Amino acid sequence: ISIDVREPSERLQDILDLARFTDMKLEEDFSFWFDPAEEIDESTRRALDQNREEIIPTEPVPGVPGAYWCEMNRNFVRFLTDNDETKLFDALARLAARGEANVGEGSRYVGSFRACGLVVPVFELSEGASASDVAPGTQALARALAEALTVTERLNDKERRARQGLVSRAVTIR
């Protein structure tokens, strides 16, 4: 199938069943793209093996749907949500203005990325922090974020400045 990624297409959240948003599965490699009934040739098998070695180790954060601990040069939590981008940044700005845009002690918001129409806030963790270590703080962030998403008042000056800082650290992945 030939696909030109520059052509307009549906957004990911338009084709996913958002009622099943929390029903995600982490895969060990990219073999899920292939039909299990078909034989994979040797060069494809080698490529899959090589890619398996390069996949960023990722674990779900216990008790927080959409939050994933990732091990890179440092450890991070990526928090995947299906919230509207404007509302999400407003809510994060409210938390940031209060010093609450983190997933626990020693963590900090480092930015976010947009992919397939979704915004994914990213938090850097203190050295050696595991997924279970950050679960309580990530659960607290999820509750605070849910509450902040219900606020409809305009942002105050401090929150607007915080929002500008948050948005300036957002990148789009295509």
Q: What residue ranges belong to the model's regions?
A:
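Long, charge-dense low-complexity segments
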Residues: I1-L118, E147, V151, N156-E159, ...
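A short, solvent-exposed beta-edge/loop patch
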Residues: G111-T152
